[in-house]
């Protein structure tokens, strides 16, 4: 079960990703269990877990992470003007993801479920609000079969079981806010916005290599 203590607002050192991050994952977007969008209202892009052990260090295992993603522009949904970049380069967007079995649903097979968030220049749809309206998570049109490149930059938390679906959704909402706040720090935001650092530039080039 999820501990009752408050969640930290950011994770990872302010100086930037530390080993073993950044970690690269890629693959075509495949159909998942069909629950993220329909039951939870949280659209996810799933990619195959094949070869995961080769790139993901054993000490990390299952859990929730944050990072940045790019989709092959040849088959991805057209980006909004706020997400677009110069030329034909694929937009790089923030993301939160889970790798594991989702104890609430008692999954028997491991999955990689990626929720692509809106650009950090836009208001956060998952920000806390005093209004009691249902949170509306960021949604893109379906893009099954599109190649996705993901750069994992940090770890958020382990997997938990939950007493209710509402508790699960609320924790995912907080995950999105933690990911957003973590990525807004200068040493992480450069992976979205770019700079002159050769290491970061190389990672951004890989993200857009389709």
Curated annotation (Swiss-Prot):
Zinc or magnesium. It catalyses: riboflavin + ATP = FMN + ADP + H(+). This is Riboflavin kinase. Pfam families: Flavokinase. One of its GO terms (biological process) is FMN biosynthetic process. It comes from Emericella nidulans (strain FGSC A4 / ATCC 38163 / CBS 112.46 / NRRL 194 / M139) (Aspergillus nidulans). Catalyzes the phosphorylation of riboflavin (vitamin B2) to form flavin mononucleotide (FMN) coenzyme. Keywords: ATP-binding, Flavoprotein, FMN, Kinase, Magnesium, Metal-binding, Nucleotide-binding, Transferase, Zinc. Its EC number is 2.7.1.26. Pathway: Cofactor biosynthesis; FMN biosynthesis; FMN from riboflavin (ATP route): step 1/1. Mg(2+) binds at residues 44, 46. Residues 1-24 are annotated as: Disordered. One of its GO terms (molecular function) is ATP binding. SMART domains: Flavokinase (SM00904). The gene is fmn1. The keyword DNA repair does not apply. The active site is at residue 113. GO terms for cellular component: mitochondrion. Its cofactor is Zn(2+); Mg(2+). Belongs to the flavokinase family. Residues 1-11 have a biased composition (Pro residues). It is an enzyme of class 2 (transferase).
